[in-house]
């Protein structure tokens, strides 16, 4: 699959209410949280898009070469599903690789694994890792054909990403390698969460 067929999407449209300040701009080991997602995605695509909360847009734009847009105004505040919708609607590609902005340990190998499974079942429309029995929908692959089903869910005010998997042919990936990469799926919601890993 050609890199031009892919766009990386960092989902940074949330309010970070529980953390108390914007999580994307928190630093861990001298880099911002979102930069871990950026690094992981840039191994798989030359194009990375940040879906930003309005209060962070200007800060993200200081990172030259990264396109930054805000959630579609119709769906601002409607969660990650709105961010995925905005990315697919605004930028043309076949596949959208999503990553949260608050996973400072995210590794590129996660996407290597997801693409290896997609290569075996290329007709799937979403590819989602499952770790310890839990789906991880914010670290996944979404085909451009997900646009209409996502918009339908948003219009119905059904904002959980999991609802999408009832509408599109989804491949759920359970792989033993995820056990060694389990920290990739750790999202930091509160300052004390980070202290557990430092």
From Swiss-Prot:
This is Probable molybdenum cofactor guanylyltransferase. GTP binds at residues 11-13, 23, 71, 102. Belongs to the MobA family. It comes from the Bacteria. InterPro entries: MobA-like_NTP_Trfase (IPR025877), Molybde_CF_guanTrfase (IPR013482), Nucleotide-diphossugar_trans (IPR029044). One of its GO terms (cellular component) is cytoplasm. Mg(2+) binds at residue 102. One of its GO terms (biological process) is Mo-molybdopterin cofactor biosynthetic process. Transfers a GMP moiety from GTP to Mo-molybdopterin (Mo-MPT) cofactor (Moco or molybdenum cofactor) to form Mo-molybdopterin guanine dinucleotide (Mo-MGD) cofactor. Its cofactor is Mg(2+). Its main location: cytoplasm. It holds the Pfam family NTP_transf_3. Keywords: Cytoplasm, GTP-binding, Magnesium, Metal-binding, Molybdenum cofactor biosynthesis, Nucleotide-binding, Transferase. GO terms for molecular function: GTP binding; metal ion binding; molybdenum cofactor guanylyltransferase activity. It catalyses: Mo-molybdopterin + GTP + H(+) = Mo-molybdopterin guanine dinucleotide + diphosphate. Its EC number is 2.7.7.77.
């Amino acid at each position: 699959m050609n890199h031009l067929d892919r766009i990386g999407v960092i989902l940074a449209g949330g309010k970070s209410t529980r953390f108390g300040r914007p999580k994307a701009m928190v630093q861990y080991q001298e880099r911002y949280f979102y930069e871990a997602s950026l690094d992981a995605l840039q191994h798989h695509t030359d194009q990375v898009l940040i879906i930003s909360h309005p209060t962070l847009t200007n800060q993200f734009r200081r990172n030259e070469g990264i396109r930054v847009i805000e959630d579609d105004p119709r769906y601002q505040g409607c969660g990650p599903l709105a961010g995925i919708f905005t990315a697919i609607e605004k930028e043309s590609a076949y596949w959208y690789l999503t990553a949260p902005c608050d996973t400072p340990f995210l590794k590129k190998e996660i996407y290597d694994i997801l693409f290896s499974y997609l290569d075996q079942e290329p007709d799937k429309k979403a590819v989602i890792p499952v770790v310890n029995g839990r789906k991880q929908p914010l670290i996944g692959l979404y085909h451009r054909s997900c646009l209409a089903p996502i918009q339908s869910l948003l219009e119905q005010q059904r904002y959980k990403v999991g609802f999408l998997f009832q509408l599109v042919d989804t491949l759920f990936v359970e792989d033993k390698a995820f056990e060694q990469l389990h920290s990739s799926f750790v999202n930091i919601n509160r300052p004390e969460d980070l202290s557990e890993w430092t």
